[in-house]
Amino acid sequence: MGFKGAWNKRNRLIENPEEYYRLYKKLQRAYKLVREAIKRYGSFELLKGKTSLRDLEELLEERKQVLENLKKQLREAHKGKPKIEAEGDEQLKELIREVNRVQSEVRALEIITNRVRKYEEIYAQYKQMTEKKAYVDPKLWMRIRKMNEAGERKVVRTYSRATTIIPEFVGHTIAVHNGKTFIPVYITQDMVGHKLGEFAPTRTFKGHPDKTAKVVKKK
């Protein structure tokens, strides 16, 4: 089972692993902020299932327009009315409540839209850095790199089956998750260029049934 030449086909590594790792962490933080904003401010009635930047921007503009119209109505309703009369007007009170509600929606949408925009900007940088490159899990890469510098050889666990094995991994034992448990995989030179998941099968072959097994005859 020889893998000679496999690495030549995939020899497109990211030039700066440290910058890649920093950008990866930044992307994770931005994603977390988006999720928090949607959970805190984004009710289903408000977002209407829209989470893409373009949809959110359109929704924000729409709500801003509604707010402007309501404010205009409020100004018209206040015209020529004494303060005491205005305070007792139930229709006016309802209009004020509606203005406050839409104003809160606009603020919430602005927060969500700004965070989604920031996330998409970071994701664009991340995509540009990783496009047409061999995928290596950034956390695993940095951990192996630190172990190489310290001369350590501990077993490292990972869920990243899609990670491409790179020369820095040679000599390490990486426990790869197969969906049920971690399978220890000792990395050799021949494995370079392949995926970690190739060496931690998700299914095991238990053999064919014995020839002596009962065969049900067709009637």
Curated annotation (Swiss-Prot):
The record's annotation in InterPro entries points to: Ribosomal_uS19, Ribosomal_uS19_bac-type, Ribosomal_uS19_CS, Ribosomal_uS19_SF
Q: Which Pfam families match?
A: Ribosomal_S19 (PF00203)
Q: Name one GO biological process term.
A: ribosomal small subunit assembly
Q: Where is this region: Small ribosomal subunit protein uS19?
A: 129-219
Q: Name one GO molecular function term.
A: structural constituent of ribosome
Q: Taxonomically, which superkingdom?
A: Bacteria
Q: Which SUPFAM superfamilies match?
A: Ribosomal protein S19
Q: Which UniProt key words apply to this protein?
A: Ribonucleoprotein, Ribosomal protein, RNA-binding, rRNA-binding
Q: Which residues does the annotated region (Unknown) include? A: 1-128
Which PROSITE patterns does its entry note?
RIBOSOMAL_S19 (PS00323)
Q: Does the keyword Ribonucleoprotein apply?
A: yes
Whether Phosphoprotein counts among this entry's keywords is no
What's this protein's function? Answer: Protein S19 forms a complex with S13 that binds strongly to the 16S ribosomal RNA.
Instruction: Tell me its family.
Output: Belongs to the universal ribosomal protein uS19 family.
Name by which UniProt lists this protein: Small ribosomal subunit protein uS19
What organism does this protein naturally occur in? Aquifex pyrophilus
